[in-house]
A protein has these predicted regions:
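Scaffold/interface architecture of coatomer-like assemblies
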Residues: 1-204
């Protein structure tokens, strides 16, 4: 169970013990066996010599650490306009990825068609910015198709936007499940979209 305690100034309270908490399940008090303080602010420990991610296995090992924050930037290309909206979103996101994260934060960029086994985490801010510059907005744009799945969408006619919304919801759900498999504790998905429309049953 993750707990964040702040004082009146919005500052973290770090000197609490398990006796300061009460956990209830169905109204019944539960015993607290352990309480662990985790400070994950993206700063690099003085003895941390493994900032560069060398492989997916190394990324998974780093992601499992309690003091490492994990972020996925989900670019919703189906609901971002091709021209000005995409340009503005890329500019804002490029600045964001180069300034918002700490040296130990793990960050990945993906879209609807990125399989979870192709998600790649990095700490290289320039690499992230380069990935962002390659992102495209495809709202209302159906050709060329990027995959066989998208080719099949073309036969849905007026229902194609609903199908795209369902694909978005399914991809988000798969990403949530994937992040949950990395470790206990908090992970973050940053959704970049103009609107995700009617998500359909996958969003329930």
């Amino acid at each position: 169970m993750d707990i964040t305690v702040l004082n009146k100034k919005g500052e973290p309270v770090t000197n609490l013990t398990k006796d300061d908490f009460q956990v209830l399940e169905d109204g019944q008090p539960q015993s607290i066996d352990t309480l662990k303080l985790i400070e994950a602010n993206g700063s690099a420990p003085e003895d941390d010599m493994s900032l560069e991610i060398r492989s997916p296995a190394h990324a998974a090992a780093e992601a499992a650490r309690d003091d490492v924050r994990v972020f996925v930037i989900f670019w919703d290309e189906y609901h971002i306009g091709q021209m000005l909206p995409a340009t503005r979103a890329r500019e804002a996101l490029s600045n964001f990825v180069q300034t918002a994260f700490g040296p130990t934060d793990l960050v990945a960029v993906m879209d609807q068609l990125t399989p979870t086994d192709a998600i790649r985490f990095t700490r290289d801010r320039r690499e992230l910015a380069d990935q962002v510059h390659q992102l495209k907005g495809r709202q209302g744009v159906y050709l060329p198709a990027r995959s066989a799945m998208e080719e099949a969408q073309l036969y849905r006619g007026p229902g194609i936007e609903f199908v795209r919304a369902q694909v978005t919801a399914s991809a988000l759900e798969a990403t949530i499940n994937y992040l949950g498999s990395l470790k206990e504790g908090r992970k973050s998905i940053l959704l970049v979209s103009s609107t995700i429309g009617p998500l359909g049953p996958s969003a329930a």
